[in-house]
Swiss-Prot record:
Belongs to the carotenoid/retinoid oxidoreductase family. Pfam families: Amino_oxidase. This is All-trans-zeta-carotene desaturase. The lineage of its organism: Bacteria, Pseudomonadati, Myxococcota, Myxococcia, Myxococcales. The keyword Repressor does not apply. PANTHER family: PHYTOENE DESATURASE (PTHR43734:SF1). It is an enzyme of class 1 (oxidoreductase). One of its GO terms (biological process) is carotenoid biosynthetic process. Pathway: Carotenoid biosynthesis; lycopene biosynthesis. Dehydrogenates carotenes in the trans conformation: converts all-trans-zeta-carotene into all-trans-lycopene, one of the last dehydrogenation steps of lycopene biosynthesis. FAD binds at residues 12-45. It comes from Myxococcus xanthus.
Length: 529
């Protein structure tokens, strides 16, 4: 696949979301000629953010609001001989998340383990000891699980080879996440607080593999981080870095099709007819949308990306989003808040498959960034980002009525997490339903967390980063291995870059696989304390 005469290869990246930006930095840093083609005028994809108010006085994030394991992001910059701190500033949060429960109690999760033990002591005298045991189990699991199951291409069933699996068997990956956590804590409040990220994998703690206990572990071990200026600023910083490395950006330029000739991706055709040639194409867009809309149907025949196969796949829930600009600041509350209602513990089929909207007492998440970073609002003002899980558009939901009901109910719901009197402080507001995600952001079925992470959609059974059927075509993002979430999206970009550097005769991607050590090794991590 190397270009004639050993010249620098040209890679087109479709989409300037976090996966595309990570791929652009990786590839430009290794000497590839990179062109990023993005339909929007600003970078970020779902991470681009939005502004509220006649003069844009409120700025809010629309996608990720949590950065885990910042060392992975640092390493993307470092391997390109750049410093992350020259482009963005990361802020560690003192409290990861305050989780409110159905019984009126709450738990503050934190990377400060002495304080975490004190928090858990409120739930029983044995909980601090249980935490120490669970963290020790996590330390043993983390290095093995991260490298063997996340920092790997998973391109064939060798992913499940006995030599690979043997070191993990003592962690009982066949257990559910609920059973694994309950085996230590024996309290549904603690178990569901630590297991709640499974919702964003398209699963329930009682159906999610215990392998994913690495997610709450790394949040307690490394903390949760915010990007100063919001995650939209991370998009801009990554774009600046890629440009500094020589990448070219074509913004406001939608792609009509990926061009395929004799089974090989040879470039893209832009809306309007312009043709761009390339040696390889990296697509960073919602996988099901991109396959159906950008890849010719005849090139997908017999693959796992046919329209029929994508219709049969299982997808995550969607979300109803409320974005508020407020004329007050809730400075006494943490950055991240979760309410777990009694319905979060439901295990009936309707609940497990996200069939209906819960309008009575839904669980929800709130981002209150002004307490950490006042840059998104005028002095004395702030923003809130409220997320309520809902079915995706594959379910028969009246979205107009759902929006009307939740617009009315959310201000009162917020009192359950200590946000009192929100209704009278709202100055600007915007709402997204599953249909917004589908129609405005090109997310198939509005399933914002992409393909569910069921056993039949994990590892080599999940769509590949390197497409098997079209040479030179790569997918990065939440729909491919290793899965949804900002951290794993960045790892999918690392996987794509590793393939491309090898195939260009440059050898493996430098410094990858990379498993951030449990002890701080960088200025950014060291600042977390």
């Amino acid at each position: 696949m190397a270009s004639e005469g050993g010249s620098v290869r040209h890679v087109i990246v479709v989409g300037a979301g976090p996966g595309g930006l990570s791929a652009a930095i990786n590839l430009a840093g290794q000497g590839f000629r990179v062109t990023v083609v993005e339909k929007d005028a600003v970078p970020g994809g779902r991470m681009k953010g939005l502004t509220l108010g006649a003069s844009g006085e409120y700025a809010v994030d629309t996608g990720p609001s949590i950065l885990q394991l910042p060392g992975v992001l640092e390493q993307i910059f470092r391997r390109a001989a750049r410093r992350l701190e020259d482009y963005v500033k990361l802020l560690p949060l003192d409290v990861n998340t305050r989780v409110h429960f159905w019984d009126g109690t709450h738990l503050d999760t934190t990377r400060h383990l002495d304080r975490m033990e004190a928090e858990l002591a409120k739930f029983g005298p044995r909980q601090a000891s249980a935490l120490r045991q669970w963290m020790e189990d996590g330390r043993e699991k983390y290095g093995i699980a991260y490298q063997k199951f996340i920092c790997t291409s998973a391109d064939n069933l060798g992913y499940y080879a006995p030599w690979r699996l043997a070191p993990t068997l003592r962690f009982k990956p066949w257990q559910t996440l609920y059973r694994q956590l309950d085996g230590f804590f024996h309290d549904d409040r603690v178990t569901y607080a630590l297991a709640y990220p499974s919702k964003y994998l398209g699963l329930h703690p009682t159906t999610c593999s215990s392998v994913f206990s690495v997610i709450p572990f790394l949040e307690l071990a490394f903390g949760v981080w915010h990007v100063e200026g919001g995650f939209r600023e991370l998009s801009r910083g990554m774009m600046r870095c890629a440009r500094d490395l020589g990448a070219t950006f074509r913004m406001g330029t939608p792609v009509e099709k990926v061009r395929v000739d004799a089974g090989r991706a040879v470039g893209v055709k832009l809306v309007g007819g312009e043709v761009l040639d390339a040696d390889a194409v990296v697509v960073n867009a919602d996988l099901a949308y991109a396959a159906r809309s950008l890849i010719p149907a005849e090139a997908r025949e017999g693959s796992r990306l046919t329209d029929a196969a994508l219709e049969r796949a299982k997808y995550s829930c969607s979300t109803f989003m409320a974005y508020y600009g407020l004329d007050t600041v809730y400075a006494d509350l943490p950055h991240h808040l979760i309410y777990l209602s009694e319905s979060a513990r439901r295990t009936d089929r309707d609940a497990l498959e996200d069939r209906h909207v819960d309008l009575e007492d839904p669980p929800f998440y709130v981002c209150n960034p002004g307490v950490t970073d006042p840059s998104g609002a005028p002095a004395g003002h702030s923003t809130l980002y409220v997320l309520v899980p809902t079915p995706n558009t594959g379910r028969p939901v009246d979205w107009v009525k759902t929006e009307q009901a939740l617009r009315e109910r959310i201000p009162a719901m917020l009192e359950k997490v200590g946000l009192k009197g929100v209704r009278e402080h709202i100055r600007e507001e915007r709402y997204f339903t599953a249909e917004t995600w589908r129609d405005d952001f090109n997310v198939f079925r509005g399933a914002v967390f992409n393909l569910s992470h069921t056993w039949l959609q994990l590892g080599p059974l999940r769509p590949k980063v390197k497409n098997r059927d079209i040479e030179g075509l790569y997918f990065v993002g939440g729909g491919t291995h290793p899965g949804s979430g900002l951290l794993t999206i960045m790892e999918s970009a690392n996987i794509a870059a590793d393939y491309l550097t090898r195939e260009a005769g440059k050898g493996p991607l430098p410094g990858w696989p990379y498993v951030p050590p449990l002890e701080p090794e960088s200025p950014v991590q060291a600042r977390a304390g």
